[in-house]
């Protein structure tokens, strides 16, 4: 997505040190959103290219030099602050030259992404942090798993967590609500020890009861009924989306969305596939991280990222 019309193109630099911590700057008194924390950067000057503009801003604000070729695209966030919209274009850097120090008297802090309190960030910067926290793959349990397979699937999910899967949706429609909650509770300590998140499908009350490390993935139908974010910022909320309208609603209710189907699927043969071009258009117009779902495999995560995705979500090929 390019900055057009009345949209202000703003660059944000995500600086990560060798400990994995990211740099945040506090907005000064007297400015819009004073006191909130944000990723350093600033707006493009007329005729300026995005990455050179970011390099200039980081030098002016922090006294460092970054090379545009060292930047990695993270996420682009269209955001509306009142009358004027902005496109917040976030790039990640792990290398820079010079001594980093505030050049404008601003407060700075280094924090691990998972330790940042999202409520202290400027609203448009929150999706940047979620993009840093969220993994490239999102595994969803098969819908045909029977309740008498609880032991087998407890083991499979535990093995997935131990081999590095960090985001798993427990979508088990043939199970009772209580059976799914019990499985999540049994897996909760292991997930916490690996900084993994388990998401219940639809079950907002269950996620509230189980607490830390247990989130919820809401359906497109649930999005229509929600008036506010269903869980605290400390618990993840995902949303199922199929079009631009649903993505727009999910921005203020969820931390991320799945967008489907990208490719034809046997489970939903009646739904036309989006294809990568349409997926990219929708994902880049959305102000939150979006996973590609539908006909996806873990090996396609890099391809998905080239088309504006956070990564890929899937069912069969992830187990």
Q: Language-model segments: what does each one mean?
A:
Residues 216-229, 256-270, 295-319:
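Glycine-rich phosphate-binding active-site loops on the catalytic face of alpha/beta enzymes
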Residues 90-94, 100-133:
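NUDIX/MutT-family hydrolases
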Residues 75-100:
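Active-site-adjacent beta-strand/loop module that shapes the phosphate/pyrophosphate-binding cleft
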Residues 139, 241, 273-283, 287-300, ...:
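Glycine-rich adenosine-cofactor-binding loop
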Residues 119, 140-142, 146, 165-179, ...:
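Catalytic beta/alpha-barrel core
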Residues 153-155, 181-186, 271-279:
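Charged helix-capping and loop-helix junction motifs
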Residues 2-22, 76:
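Conserved N-terminal beta-strand and adjoining loop/helix that marks the start
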Residues 21-61, 65, 74:
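Conserved Nudix-box catalytic region and its N-terminal flanking loop in Nudix hydrolases
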């Amino acid at each position: 997505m390019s900055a057009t019309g009345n949209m202000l193109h703003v660059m944000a630099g995500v600086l990560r040190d060798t400990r994995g911590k990211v740099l945040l700057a506090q907005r000064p008194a007297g400015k819009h959103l004073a006191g909130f924390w944000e990723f350093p950067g600033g707006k493009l000057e007329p005729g300026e290219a995005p990455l050179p503009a970011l390099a200039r801003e980081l030098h002016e604000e922090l006294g460092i030099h970054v090379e545009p070729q060292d930047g990695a695209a993270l996420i682009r966030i269209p955001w509306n602050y009142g009358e004027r919209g902005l496109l917040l274009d976030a790039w990640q850097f792990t290398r820079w030259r010079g001594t980093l120090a505030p050049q404008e008297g601003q407060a700075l802090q280094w924090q691990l992404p998972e330790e940042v309190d999202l409520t202290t960030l400027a609203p448009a910067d929150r999706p940047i942090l979620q993009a840093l926290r969220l993994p490239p793959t999102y595994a969803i349990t098969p819908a045909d798993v029977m309740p008498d397979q609880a032991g087998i699937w407890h083991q499979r999910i535990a093995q997935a967590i131990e081999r590095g899967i960090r985001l798993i949706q427990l979508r088990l429609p043939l199970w009772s609500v209580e059976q799914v909650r019990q499985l999540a509770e049994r897996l909760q300590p292991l997930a916490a020890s690996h900084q993994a998140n388990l998401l219940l499908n639809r079950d907002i009350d269950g996620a509230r009861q189980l607490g830390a490390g247990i989130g919820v993935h809401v359906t497109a139908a649930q999005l229509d009924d929600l008036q506010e974010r269903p869980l605290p910022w400390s618990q993840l909320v995902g949303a199922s989306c199929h079009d631009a309208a649903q993505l727009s609603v999910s921005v203020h209710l969820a931390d991320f969305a799945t967008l489907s189907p990208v490719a034809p699927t046997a489970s939903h043969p009646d739904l036309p596939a989006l294809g990568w071009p349409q997926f990219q258009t929708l994902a880049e117009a959305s102000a939150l991280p979006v996973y590609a779902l539908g006909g996806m495999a873990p090996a396609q995560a890099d391809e998905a990222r080239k088309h504006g995705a956070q990564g890929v979500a899937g069912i069969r090929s992830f187990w």
